[in-house]
């Protein structure tokens, strides 16, 4: 890794709640390199239109859709939109694509199989190659992945992965190694649900809206996340509370702080006092992470952004990657 990991704030704010350009400029002023725009047409403004607004109207070094749903949008249209944005804002377009489980679910469509999704990734990659084989978004196109098969397939198809595997150090280490097992130059970013709280007792209510979607990932690959039978049962209890119609926003999960909620929170979220956020960020980025995409869906993220930005920047600055991590 030749430079410190980059920091992007993912803007996942419901219709009418906040202007993405205003939030983007604020995030950049606090030290983020740019922003991602969530793709959920029933809940949030269109990520492509807002990406253009942010790129044209702010000083963000990087901006674009995170995560664009290939389960709803055809890869050919996604490629066309990315090429257009890149033509207007060369070197600044950043994009993450995925199956888009929540948006697909909300539209009543089937979630693409891994084979179908991998074909879509390859189509997207091919559509973004110039005639001489040059990629239009070198190092700036990633595929979201949580489980081991998806991580491997995405690294092979795109050469870039946004890991959504939580914050447990052992799991992240395995995921980074897997992403680079066949392609050592794979760009590896980590999706982090983080928030600074002054009192550890505030962690439970602050984290509640995102627990259900995290639990669903754990349930889908229990061995990968190191769950025993009892832990799997607890994770299932949390997963069924998740409301996909409110995915990524406040009240997506009922505010219940039980053993299952604590398990998911400890494995998947980084909601803690600033010193703890800094320490754990340093450990995570020291594994060879190229960048962090910070979830913006928690209600307290925006008002708490200055403290969060400071803690993350301190953690990234103190990351000391080893040769083995890259």
Residue ranges and their predicted role:
Residues 43-53, 114-115, 165-182, 300-306:
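Active-site-adjacent beta->alpha loops and helix N-cap segments on the catalytic face
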Residues 15-27, 77-81, 144-153, 206-211, ...:
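Short, acidic/polar
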Residues 2-3, 45-68, 72, 117-130, ...:
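Alpha-helix-loop-beta-strand connector modules within alpha/beta enzyme cores
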Residues 5-11, 35-37, 62-68, 93-97, ...:
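Hydrophobic faces of well-ordered beta-strands that scaffold small-molecule active sites
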Residues 108-132, 181-283, 320-325:
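An alpha-helical appendage that flanks or caps ligand/catalytic pockets
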Residues 2, 24-29, 51-62, 82-93, ...:
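Acidic (Asp/Glu)-rich catalytic clusters
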Residues 1-62, 66, 325:
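N-terminal beta1-alpha1-beta2 module of alpha/beta enzyme domains
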